[in-house]
């Protein structure tokens, strides 16, 4: 996920409502389409139903957030955004923000905590195993790493997630943020970056068929592969300034990059962060747990 040798240098915000991160994971980083009905109708008329297998795209390219848009990161629960915010990222179980560009968070390479037993009971072969035991993300032990090692398994995983994508589209979201692209770095060598790119391309295909843009989450080391091979439309980075990665992203994505810095681990003041010419204009500051405004720990600022 990042241009670092440490495989645990990664996002830490998957479903903040589900649980609090443990101490060891404190600094690990995880995370209303107007006209979508027309796009879906066009797909149906043309016979290109929005399935992973279809290979069909909705008329017109789904658009990323406009460059420079302030996008609030609300994975800890949706709330009325502060003044000046033009978009939000919310969990797939939440609703989009009316009148704002809304991104739907989906965990695409690991299981969600609430779904752990479903995957083990109903599709255990799609969960990566080591010595007969399911392989977990050690920093998020209630998440299992999905087995994207073969084309057949990738296809089935993508089909399982298709309903979530469809729900995001029907709810009125504009885009998908797909998390844990770097899960292969926690696979004990059983998965590769090529596997991740191949699965991501299936997700991008389905998102586009649903009329949704799709964002690469973190993984600066993917370079142009995320854009050119996987088919991502923009990127969401956590702490690109803190870890001196912003230029790695902007070299590929230009202004189509959203960055979230965290108040507990800034490199300098937030004013200094915003003054750095390498930092994208769509940069915000949030508290690590992505709390809502009624929580005393809540933090939100934008450049």
What are these regions (language model features)?
Residues 11-13, 17-18, 224:
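Residue-level detector of alpha-helix boundary/anchor positions
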Residues 4-9, 18, 22, 28:
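Intrinsic-disorder-associated, low-complexity terminal segments enriched in Asp/Asn/His/Tyr and depleted
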Residues 57-303:
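Glycan-processing catalytic domains of CAZymes
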Residues 14-17, 51, 82, 238-239:
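N-terminal targeting/docking segments
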Residues 13, 20, 30-59:
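Secretory targeting and sorting signals
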Residues 8, 43, 49-51, 269, ...:
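Disulfide-bonded cysteine motifs in exported proteins
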Residues 21, 27-29, 178, 233:
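Intrinsic disorder/low-complexity segments enriched in polar/small residues
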């Amino acid at each position: 996920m990042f241009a670092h040798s440490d495989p645990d240098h990664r996002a830490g915000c998957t479903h903040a409502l589900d649980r609090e991160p443990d101490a060891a994971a404190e600094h690990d980083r995880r995370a209303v389409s107007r006209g979508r009905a027309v796009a879906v109708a066009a797909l149906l008329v043309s016979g290109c139903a929005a399935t992973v297998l279809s290979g069909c795209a909705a008329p017109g390219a789904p658009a990323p957030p406009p460059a420079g848009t302030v996008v609030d990161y609300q994975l800890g629960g949706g709330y009325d955004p502060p003044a000046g915010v033009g978009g939000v990222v919310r969990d797939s179980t939440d609703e989009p923000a009316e009148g704002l560009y809304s991104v739907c968070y989906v965990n695409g390479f690991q299981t969600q905590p609430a779904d752990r037993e479903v995957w083990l009971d109903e599709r255990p072969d799609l969960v990566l195993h080591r010595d007969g035991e399911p392989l977990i993300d050690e920093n998020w032990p209630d998440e299992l790493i999905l087995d994207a090692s073969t084309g057949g398994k990738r296809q089935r995983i993508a089909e399982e997630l298709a309903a979530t994508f469809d729900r995001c589209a029907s709810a009125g979201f504009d885009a998908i943020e797909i998390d844990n692209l770097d899960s292969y770095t926690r696979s004990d060598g059983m998965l590769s970056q090529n596997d991740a790119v191949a699965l991501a391309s299936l997700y991008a295909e389905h998102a586009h068929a649903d009329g949704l843009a799709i964002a690469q989450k973190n993984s600066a080391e993917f370079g142009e592969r995320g854009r050119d091979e996987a088919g991502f439309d923009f990127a969401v980075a956590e702490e690109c300034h803190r870890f001196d990665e912003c230029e790695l992203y902007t070299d590929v994505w230009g202004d189509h990059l959203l960055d979230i810095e965290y108040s507990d681990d800034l490199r300098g003041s937030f004013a200094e962060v915003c003054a750095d010419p390498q930092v994208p204009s769509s940069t915000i500051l949030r508290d690590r747990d992505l709390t809502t405004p009624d929580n005393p720990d809540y933090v939100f600022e934008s450049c």
